[in-house]
Amino acid sequence: MIMEIRKIGDPILKIKAKKVEKIDEKVKNLVRDMIETMKFSNGVGLAAPQVGESLRIIVVDYEENPIAFINPEILEMDGEVLDYEGCLSVPGVEVPIKRAERIIFKAQDLQGRTKRYKAKGLLARVIQHEVDHLEGILILDRAVEESTLAEEK
């Protein structure tokens, strides 16, 4: 089922999401709906708060294969890259954001197994973006000045 994507101004986007305690049918159905919604919206990632559920669940489109991560936690970050990001919850806006180039993170899969993952490049950026949603952080909160040099008038 395609879900409504919550937009900037919705209070659920600004609160810390709750840990998933049990991966049951309700969680699996939510993940299915999130993947369908992400694909329908041409997104590369989606976090549960974006569809109105305050749960620590993200889905990402990895090489055309959507993957769900339950209770993701970034353990290590390395390197720094500045690039523009958009967000389904902040339509029509792209802002420059510094992100780690490489990350190591852990998360549970849909069977409840905790695994460690390495990600780099775009995938690392998407995961950091979606984990931000779980912390109540939007791209406008992370945006950096486009230039640190300004001409004085």
Swiss-Prot record:
Give me the residues that bind Fe cation, please.
87, 129, 133
Does Signal count among this protein's keywords? no
Q: Which residues form the active site?
A: 130
CDD domains given in the database record: Pep_deformylase
Q: Which residues form a coiled coil?
A: none
Into which EC class is this enzyme placed?
Answer: hydrolase
Its recorded reaction(s) are: N-terminal N-formyl-L-methionyl-[peptide] + H2O = N-terminal L-methionyl-[peptide] + formate
Alphabetical keyword list: Hydrolase, Iron, Metal-binding, Protein biosynthesis
Cofactor requirement: Fe(2+)
EC number from the UniProt entry: 3.5.1.88
What are the BP-aspect GO terms?
co-translational protein modification; translation
Instruction: List the molecular function annotations (GO) for this entry.
Output: metal ion binding; peptide deformylase activity
The protein's matches in InterPro entries, at most eight in alphabetical order, are given as: Peptide_deformylase, Peptide_deformylase_sf
According to the record, cofactor stoichiometry and binding are noted as: Binds 1 Fe(2+) ion.
Q: Which family does it belong to?
A: Belongs to the polypeptide deformylase family.
Tell me which HAMAP family the record gives: Pep_deformylase
This chain's function reads: Removes the formyl group from the N-terminal Met of newly synthesized proteins. Requires at least a dipeptide for an efficient rate of reaction. N-terminal L-methionine is a prerequisite for activity but the enzyme has broad specificity at other positions.
- Family annotation (NCBIfam families): pept_deformyl (TIGR00079), PRK00150.1-3 (NF001159)
Q: What is this protein called?
A: Peptide deformylase
The scientific name of the source species is Dictyoglomus turgidum (strain DSM 6724 / Z-1310)
Taxonomic lineage per UniProt?
Bacteria, Pseudomonadati, Dictyoglomota, Dictyoglomia, Dictyoglomales
